[in-house]
Each structure stands twice: as structure tokens, then as C-alpha cells.
Amino acid sequence: MEHIARFFFGVSGNVIALFLFLSPVVTFWRIIRKRSTEDFSGVPYNMTLLNCLLSAWYGLPFVSPNNILVSTINGTGSVIEAIYVVIFLIFAVDRRARLRMLGLLSIVVSIFATVVLVSLLALHGNARKVFCGLAATIFSICMYASPLSIMRLVIKTKSVEYMPFLLSLAVFLCGTSWFIYGLLGRDPFIIIPNGCGSFLGLVQLILYFIYRKNKGPAVPAGKGEAAAAADVEDAKKVAAAVEMADATTTNKAAADTVVGDGKVVASQV
């Protein structure tokens, strides 16, 4: 019965994580149409790519037995994120931005290659699992921290304009699914990052219900029009900066995340 329940939550996590990975599609369609990345940042997609690669590697049978569902979603996520990165490279706003993306991509490839080579050539058995699990967990937690910027923005503006309900719900459900999957499999490298993702998703939902009636940036009391306008403009800039990171949430398995248009996607382990 426990195996069936674990399989169920693993499949559920795969489905929800896929939604999170695909959430920035609208943004990338805009980039393709305008043939420019404009002010969008490609950093979150490079980080999510690394997260997915490490998590997919961790889930392979010779690294971590009985975690193949972790590999399936993160393998899929790796392909999706790689496509996003390629689009950024093609439509980079200028040569400097393109070189920056290439630099980040080279770092991603170097880190992943190092983890793979060390785990294959120097480690075996449980030592290999622990090493790869730690690497994946560290970057999963970093990805789950992405929503913090959006939550700060919501509290500052008292508006949920930049934090869509469905995306926040997906982040919570994704993190929760993989958290339970990890509990049933007694795997701390899945439990820890996705526990963080589930908690942050819950906080997002709480903030949404607190400020759900405010659909536009609020004007802080006691501020003049100029100051209020500055706050609104600042809010827009912050939203644009974080725009591509929330995805979460998608985990090591994709429970860990993606941010598109002010949203986050996590990646799951």
C-alpha cells in the first residue's frame, strides 16, 4: 500500500511540476515575437536547468534506487529549461547579454559535469547517493528561495498583482506531493527541499488571501503622489527582475520551481 501511495504522489508531482516548467511559455512566445529578451533575466532559467540536471542525475537507479520518478520530471524539465536558455541566447538584447548567458551556461555545465565525474569515478554506493543528493538539495533550496522576492513585493505593495493564485497553488501542491513522496521513501534529500517548497507555497497562498482584494499596487498611507508613484515603479522593476524564477518551484523532482511574469517555478527532487 505504501508503494502505491508513493507512486501516486510521485506521478502527481510530475504532472504539477510539468505545469510549473511550462508556465513561462507565454513570456518566451513574447520574446520570439519581438525577437528580443527586453528586460527579462535569463539567470533563473540557467539555475533551474542546473537544478533539474542534478535532480535528474540523483534519481537515476545507480545513484538513488527507487527514485526514477524524480528523474523523469527533472529530465523533462532539463529539456524545457535548455530550450528557454537557447531562446535567450538567440534573442539576447545585445552581445553583452549573450556573453553573460554563455558564461552562466558554461558554469552550469561545469558544475554538473564535475558532480557526474566525481560520483562515477570516485564514489560508490551510499557515498555516491549522499554526494549527489547534497548537490541537488542545495540548488533545490536555492530555487525555492525565488518566491521570497515576490512575497516581499506583495507585502510592500499590498497587492497580489504579481503573484497569480493558480501558480502559488501549483507551487504548494507540487512541493507537498514531493514532500510526501520523500517521506514515504524515507529520503531526506527529497524531504528537505520539498518541505521548504511546500511551506513557501503555503505562505504565498496565505498572502494571496490576505491581499486578494487588491489587484493593483496600493498607495502606502502618508505618502505623497510622487513617493507613491516611485513605489509602484519600483514594484514593477522588482517584478520584472524576478519574473523568470518562480518555477518552482519545480524540486528535485520539480518540486523545485519557475518564475514567469512575476511567478516562480520550483524544481523537484
UniProtKB/Swiss-Prot annotation:
Q: How does it sit in the membrane?
A: Multi-pass membrane protein
* One Pfam match: MtN3_slv
- Please report the name of this protein according to its UniProt entry: Bidirectional sugar transporter SWEET1a
- Which Gene3D superfamilies is this protein grouped with? 1.20.1280.290
Q: How does it assemble?
A: Forms homooligomers and/or heterooligomers.
The family database entries (InterPro entries) matched by this protein are listed as:
SWEET, SWEET_rpt
The molecular function GO annotations come to:
sugar transmembrane transporter activity
Instruction: Name a biological process GO annotation.
Output: carbohydrate transport
Single GO cellular component term: membrane
Domain MtN3/slv, first and last residues per copy: 8-96, 132-215
Q: What PANTHER family does the database record attribute to this sequence?
A: BIDIRECTIONAL SUGAR TRANSPORTER SWEET1A, RAG1-ACTIVATING PROTEIN 1
List the keywords (alphabetical).
Answer: Cell membrane, Membrane, Repeat, Sugar transport, Transmembrane, Transmembrane helix, Transport
Q: Which family does it belong to?
A: Belongs to the SWEET sugar transporter family.
Q: Reply yes or no: does the keyword Cell inner membrane apply.
A: no
* Membrane spanning residue stretches: 7-27, 43-63, 73-93, 101-121, 130-150, 165-185, 190-210
Localization per record: Cell membrane
Q: Which residues lie on this side of the membrane: Cytoplasmic?
A: 28-42, 94-100, 151-164, 211-269
- Does the keyword section mention Repressor? no
Extracellular topological domain ranges are: 1-6, 64-72, 122-129, 186-189
Q: Give a short account of what the protein does.
A: Mediates both low-affinity uptake and efflux of sugar across the plasma membrane.
